[in-house]
């Protein structure tokens, strides 16, 4: 015997379809260089113009010049879900 489903279940309509963005790890560019420089300043009595930390200052400046910030690309999936939601 085969069973017939009289009333198939229906999904509830969603008012808005949205996807939550991924949480990205906050990576600090040049963070290691900055931490090393701050540690050097702390070890030398808080003086920021010491000759011992000059190489770390140069490394941090070089890192800041060469590092480019990534531009955040806009996610288009929410746009497509909004259009699809009108059809459902």
Swiss-Prot record:
Alphabetized Pfam families for the sequence: CHCH
BP terms from Gene Ontology: mitochondrial translation
Motif Cx9C motif 1 per record, residues: 30-40
Name which cysteines form disulfide bonds: 30-63, 40-53
Positions of short motif Cx9C motif 2:
53-63
Q: Which UniProt keywords apply?
A: Disulfide bond, Mitochondrion, Ribonucleoprotein, Ribosomal protein
Check the record and name the PROSITE patterns matching this protein. CHCH
InterPro entries for the chain: CHCH (IPR010625), Ribosomal_mS37_fun (IPR017264)
Tell me one GO molecular function of this protein.
Answer: structural constituent of ribosome
Q: Which GO terms describe its cellular component?
A: mitochondrial small ribosomal subunit
Ranges for domain CHCH: 27-71
Task: Report the subcellular localization.
Answer: Mitochondrion; Mitochondrion matrix
What family classification does the UniProt entry report for this protein?
A: Belongs to the mitochondrion-specific ribosomal protein mS37 family.
Please describe what this protein does.
Component of the mitochondrial ribosome (mitoribosome), a dedicated translation machinery responsible for the synthesis of mitochondrial genome-encoded proteins, including at least some of the essential transmembrane subunits of the mitochondrial respiratory chain. The mitoribosomes are attached to the mitochondrial inner membrane and translation products are cotranslationally integrated into the membrane.
Oligomer and partners: Component of the mitochondrial small ribosomal subunit (mt-SSU). Mature yeast 74S mitochondrial ribosomes consist of a small (37S) and a large (54S) subunit. The 37S small subunit contains a 15S ribosomal RNA (15S mt-rRNA) and at least 32 different proteins. The 54S large subunit contains a 21S rRNA (21S mt-rRNA) and at least 45 different proteins.
Q: What is this protein called?
A: Small ribosomal subunit protein mS37
Its source organism is Schizosaccharomyces pombe (strain 972 / ATCC 24843)
Q: What is the lineage of its organism?
A: Eukaryota, Fungi, Dikarya, Ascomycota, Taphrinomycotina
Name of the gene encoding the protein in the UniProt record: mrp10
């Amino acid at each position: 015997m085969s069973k017939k489903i009289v009333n198939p279940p229906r999904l509830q309509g969603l008012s808005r379809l949205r996807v939550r963005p991924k949480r990205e790890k906050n990576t600090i560019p040049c963070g290691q260089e900055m931490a090393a420089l701050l540690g050097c300043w702390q070890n030398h009595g808080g003086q920021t113009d010491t000759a011992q930390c000059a190489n770390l200052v140069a490394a941090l400046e070089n890192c800041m010049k060469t590092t480019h910030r990534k531009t955040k690309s806009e996610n288009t999936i929410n746009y497509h879900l909004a259009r699809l939601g009108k059809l459902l």
